[in-house]
Regions:
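Active-site-proximal alpha-helical scaffolds that flank and shape metal-associated catalytic sites
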Residues: 153-157
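Conserved small/polar residues in nucleotide/adenosyl-binding loops
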Residues: 160-163
Length: 163
């Protein structure tokens, strides 16, 4: 199963789900358990705030944990709790050349993973990950219509980028 994930600073987005890119980590089980993800003996509250800008999305485990939450939300919407998943993710165009390989390794740091999200157990095997320039998918099927010089604008929660 291919799952496309937009790892935004404001929101994580998939084909059918969108949620804030916030992660709060706890050593002990928190009292409030809305959107609680349990992974590797740690507790993560998902979506409580937005992720601060960082030039390297691999600098901490937040985007990995957010990826697990995004996959769980997609699987849950299909009535599933296990799957072999191929991730399709994006990076800003100017970062693809320098960060593509590291981001791919980051997303594939485990061959498989077991975790709990919203009190439901999940088992995910990773079949691979492809990294694309953000926004490219929106324009891909219309490329034949473009003439001359064209620009792609990526409008996010707090930023706008011209590609």
């Amino acid at each position: 199963m291919v799952i496309g994930i937009d790892h935004g600073y404001g929101n994580m987005k998939t084909a059918t789900r969108c949620f804030p890119s916030g992660v709060a980590r706890y050593d002990k089980e928190p009292i409030f358990q809305n959107n609680l993800l349990v992974y590797n003996g740690m507790y993560y509250q998902i979506g409580e705030e937005h992720k601060e800008f960082c030039a390297e999305k691999t600098q901490d485990e937040d985007y990995y944990v957010l990826t697990l939450a995004a996959i769980a939300r997609e699987l849950d919407g299909k009535g599933m709790n296990q799957a072999k998943v191929h991730i399709a993710a994006g990076l800003p165009l100017t970062w693809v050349a320098t960060q593509k390989e590291d981001f791919q390794k980051y997303l594939l740091q485990n061959e498989s993973v077991d975790f709990i999200f919203r009190n439901k157990e999940y088992h995910v095997e990773f079949a691979g990950a492809d990294i694309y320039p953000q926004g490219f998918a929106a324009a891909f099927y219309r490329l034949q219509d473009f003439k001359g010089i064209n620009m792609l604008v990526d409008i996010d929660r707090k930023s706008t980028r011209l590609n």
